[in-house]
Regions:
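Non-heme Fe(II)/2-oxoglutarate
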Residues: 2-9, 13-104, 200-254
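Generic structural "secondary-structure junction" signal
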Residues: 32, 78, 83-84, 93, ...
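Catalytic core of non-heme Fe(II) oxygenases with the double-stranded beta-helix
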Residues: 89, 99-193, 205-209, 216-225
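A general structural signal for short secondary-structure boundary/capping elements
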Residues: 82-86, 166-170, 193-198, 211, ...
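Amphipathic alpha-helical surface "interface" segments used
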Residues: 72-77, 122-123, 230-235
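Soluble, non-transmembrane catalytic domains of enzymes that act on hydrophobic metabolites at membranes
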Residues: 61-62, 176, 192-199
C-alpha cells in the first residue's frame, strides 16, 4: 500500500517497515557503530497530514529552557503527548516498528516506563539561536537505551543534527556528519555511543523533531532515577512536569 493512501499513522508505519531493505540497513547500522539514517521512513505527506498538526497544536505547552554554553530550546514531554498529541503514540507503540528496531539492534526492546518524560517527546527550535551542544543520550537504565529521532518540521538551513561517529573508538577514525532532518526522516542510534549536537537556529527559521526512546531493561536505580529527574526538570521539561509524574507507577508496556 502506498503511504499517501493510508488512513492512519499505524497503517503508514506498517507499510514503511515492510518496504525497508533490512539486510542493507542492518549492515549500515553496525558498520557505523550503531547509528543509522533512513531518509523518508514516512512520507512527507503522511507526516504533514497526521503528525505536524499535533506538534503545532501543543506548542503552547512547551517548556523553554536556557543553559548557557550548552542548550536553548523548547520541549513537550511524553505526558503532554499522551493527553494532547496521541497520534505520535501510534508510531512509538507500533509493534511492527518495535520488532524492526529489536531486530536491528539485536536485542529485545521495550517501551520506557510510563513515568519517563523522554519516552516519546517533542523538541522545538523556534527562536534564533536555539541549539543543543554536544552530548551523549546516556542511559541511566540497567541496560542500553536507544534513541529514535524523526524530523517533523525543518524550515532551516542552519539548524542541523551534527554527529561524530566513532568518537571514542580506539581503532577507527572519527566520522563527521551534518544532517538536515526533513519530515519523515529517521535517525536511530545507541544513546551511549553517538556524540551529537544541534547547531543554532537562524532568524525566521523553525525546526521540530520527535524523539522516541526504547530500552533493553526498564529498571533504574533510585539514585540514578533522582539524578535523571533533576536533569530533565532543569534541561528539558520543568520541575512541575517531571516531579508531578516522577513517582507515578510505571505501568510498563513492551
Amino acid at each position: 500500500m502506498n503511504q499517501s493512501m493510508v488512513r492512519s499513522v499505524g497503517e503508514a508505519v506498517d507499510d514503511a517497515v515492510k518496504q525497508l531493505d533490512f539486510d542493507r540497513l542492518s549492515r549500515e547500522y553496525w558498520d557505523q557503530n550503531e547509528f543509522l539514517f533512513i531518509p523518508q521512513f514516512l512520507t512527507r505527506s503522511v507526516v504533514e497530514e497526521h503528525l505536524v498538526p499535533q506538534a503545532q497544536g501543543v506548542k503552547s505547552e512547551l517548556n523553554r529552557n536556557f543553559i548557557p554554553g550548552h542548550k536553548k530550546g523548547g520541549s513537550v514531554s511524553y505526558y503532554t503527548v499522551i493527553e494532547k498529541a496521541p497520534r505520535f503514540l501510534d508510531l512509538y507503540r507500533s509493534s511492527a516498528f518495535i520488532d524492526f528496531l529489536s531486530r536491528l539492534v539485536q536485542a529485545k526492546l521495550s517501551l520506557c516506563p510510563e513515568n519517563d518524560p523522554h519516552s516519546c517527546a517533542l523538541y522545538y527550535y523556534t527562536e534564533p539561536g536555539d541549539h543543543i551542544g554536544f552530548h551523549y543520550d546516556t542511559s541511566y537504565y540497567k541496560g542500553a537505551r536507544y534513541t529514535i529521532l524523526m524530523g517533523l518540521v525543518d524550515k532551516s538551513t542552519q539548524c542541523k543534527l551534527v554527529c561524530e561517529l566513532f568518537k571514542d573508538d580506539p581503532v577507527k577514525s572519527p566520522k563527521h556528519l551534518e544532517l538536515i532532518t526533513q519530515p519523515g526522516d529517521l535517525v536511530i542510534f545507541n544513546g551511549d555511543k553517538l556524540w551529537h549536537s544541534v547547531t543554532p537556529l537562524g532568524e525566521g527559521e523553525e525546526r521540530i523533531a520527535l524523539t522516541m526512546e526504547y530500552v533493553t531493561n526498564p529498571d533504574m536505580g533510585t539514585f540514578k532515577r533522582l539524578y535523571s529527574n533533576l536533569k530533565d526538570s532543569i534541561a528539558y521539561f520543568g520541575l512541575r512536569t517531571v516531579f508531578k509524574q516522577a513517582f507515578t507507577p510505571s505501568n510498563r508496556r513492551s
